């Protein structure tokens, strides 16, 4: 440890972590080198929001509990054999146990609390005592790839918004949103890709500057008038990062009778203590108050969220297509007395659920070689294997042209049950025959069709009322473990905060071996199949049709599925 005594063990400004590149291994095999590199990649300064504090994204979403735990995880992964499994409890390596070569090399449980105690107050006490860590979704599960990880999902959402509200034509229209953090930072690029202009309000100027540097936002403004002028004067879609507080800017538009075409928000409202700046407060004052009076920070932040949501509701009344983008801001406003906070829909039931019914979601992969050419070759392979999807091809072309890699080169690509296994096998074969310089890892966001229970986001408004049933992500994690994913994670509270979600993740390493091919066949079929199963069980016809076509064995539905074939 390099911290002085008395310092926060999660802070070390002397460290710069980057994943190794190339084919030389620090671990005993690629199956343990893969999680080692992806853990380090999560903390690359080009990837993480606050790497010196182990914070990857999403408020306080961390990769390890503290630096001592990080060092010990690295040490264990370097010595771990291919018949052993490391257990990680909220960012702390707690055990190594004998398993077998087809078992996961790492099993991770982050931020899980018994339901009665599953709230921010109890979590924060445990966090202060060094007993827990908030893993968000891909922070503590070591498969964050920077803002690209959410770009395509956001792009797909905005394209759906254009189709639903504007006959598919976003020309001359603009989006108002808040938040340019690790997730929200994807919005400006996704918006312009979909043909919209955007004003994204952000209170932390360094985040706007970072998005400018990495090509995710086009311009910076320091006043609403300046931002509006930039949009008005541009002949092409343009994104503007506006320095300010969303709780101030959104009501200003109401007062000035200016109605955006689309309104949403991706501030870190899920965490009122650490993720949302109260009205009238500076960043430094908020930092001081978090040390002095947490309850006051939370209360004041939630009051400010209520102001913002009230403005969003008014803009919706005036004709703006308004949607919640999964940060639980409606819930926070409801708790502050905005009784109609849920009058605008969440993005999943409004725009994404039909994709989930076919197991389509945020499939992603990263090149452990560190060579961008490996990603470009896999891009081409995706086009070869899925030749009849021009929308997907267009996405891949735009991604190559407009998205800068952060850390290890990676790609996000929304594909479903019928394609994930085929792509995984193709990538594994490319490693085997030397077409790729090193193995790739395939993972996904926890925001996927079968891996999350989140009543205010992914499972909002389920047809059968099963929004809060969290058996499904538990079954997903168990099945991915049985199938032999390289590492599997089970988290609580990602996206929407403590008490509001449970979710699971998996990553599988394509090392070119025959064993990997067998594991890929199981994992990359079963993982999206659980999403089809979950939605078919809830009564969705699209999911039932997909289950029938893919010959899933769903005991309670098999007689019905036979009639659909």
UniProtKB/Swiss-Prot annotation:
<protein>
    <recommendedName>
        <fullName>Urocanate hydratase</fullName>
        <ecNumber>4.2.1.49</ecNumber>
    </recommendedName>
</protein>
<feature type="binding site">
    <location>
        <position position="202"/>
    </location>
    <ligand>
        <name>NAD(+)</name>
    </ligand>
</feature>
<dbReference type="GO" id="GO:0019557">
    <property type="term" value="P:L-histidine catabolic process to glutamate and formate"/>
</dbReference>
<feature type="binding site">
    <location>
        <begin position="276"/>
        <end position="277"/>
    </location>
    <ligand>
        <name>NAD(+)</name>
    </ligand>
</feature>
<feature type="binding site">
    <location>
        <begin position="58"/>
        <end position="59"/>
    </location>
    <ligand>
        <name>NAD(+)</name>
    </ligand>
</feature>
<dbReference type="InterPro" id="IPR023637">
    <property type="entry name" value="Urocanase-like"/>
</dbReference>
<dbReference type="InterPro" id="IPR035085">
    <property type="entry name" value="Urocanase_Rossmann-like"/>
</dbReference>
<feature type="binding site">
    <location>
        <position position="136"/>
    </location>
    <ligand>
        <name>NAD(+)</name>
    </ligand>
</feature>
<comment type="function">
    <text>Catalyzes the conversion of urocanate to 4-imidazolone-5-propionate.</text>
</comment>
<dbReference type="Pfam" id="PF17392">
    <property type="entry name" value="Urocanase_C"/>
</dbReference>
<feature type="binding site">
    <location>
        <begin position="182"/>
        <end position="184"/>
    </location>
    <ligand>
        <name>NAD(+)</name>
    </ligand>
</feature>
<keyword id="KW-0369">Histidine metabolism</keyword>
<dbReference type="InterPro" id="IPR038364">
    <property type="entry name" value="Urocanase_central_sf"/>
</dbReference>
<dbReference type="InterPro" id="IPR055351">
    <property type="entry name" value="Urocanase"/>
</dbReference>
<feature type="binding site">
    <location>
        <begin position="266"/>
        <end position="270"/>
    </location>
    <ligand>
        <name>NAD(+)</name>
    </ligand>
</feature>
<dbReference type="Pfam" id="PF01175">
    <property type="entry name" value="Urocanase"/>
</dbReference>
<dbReference type="InterPro" id="IPR035401">
    <property type="entry name" value="Urocanase_C"/>
</dbReference>
<feature type="active site">
    <location>
        <position position="413"/>
    </location>
</feature>
<feature type="binding site">
    <location>
        <position position="207"/>
    </location>
    <ligand>
        <name>NAD(+)</name>
    </ligand>
</feature>
<keyword id="KW-0963">Cytoplasm</keyword>
<dbReference type="GO" id="GO:0019556">
    <property type="term" value="P:L-histidine catabolic process to glutamate and formamide"/>
</dbReference>
<dbReference type="InterPro" id="IPR023636">
    <property type="entry name" value="Urocanase_CS"/>
</dbReference>
<comment type="pathway">
    <text>Amino-acid degradation; L-histidine degradation into L-glutamate; N-formimidoyl-L-glutamate from L-histidine: step 2/3.</text>
</comment>
<dbReference type="Pfam" id="PF17391">
    <property type="entry name" value="Urocanase_N"/>
</dbReference>
<keyword id="KW-0456">Lyase</keyword>
<comment type="similarity">
    <text>Belongs to the urocanase family.</text>
</comment>
<dbReference type="GO" id="GO:0005737">
    <property type="term" value="C:cytoplasm"/>
</dbReference>
<keyword id="KW-0520">NAD</keyword>
<dbReference type="InterPro" id="IPR036190">
    <property type="entry name" value="Urocanase_sf"/>
</dbReference>
<feature type="binding site">
    <location>
        <position position="495"/>
    </location>
    <ligand>
        <name>NAD(+)</name>
    </ligand>
</feature>
<dbReference type="InterPro" id="IPR035400">
    <property type="entry name" value="Urocanase_N"/>
</dbReference>
<feature type="binding site">
    <location>
        <position position="325"/>
    </location>
    <ligand>
        <name>NAD(+)</name>
    </ligand>
</feature>
<feature type="binding site">
    <location>
        <begin position="245"/>
        <end position="246"/>
    </location>
    <ligand>
        <name>NAD(+)</name>
    </ligand>
</feature>
<dbReference type="GO" id="GO:0016153">
    <property type="term" value="F:urocanate hydratase activity"/>
</dbReference>
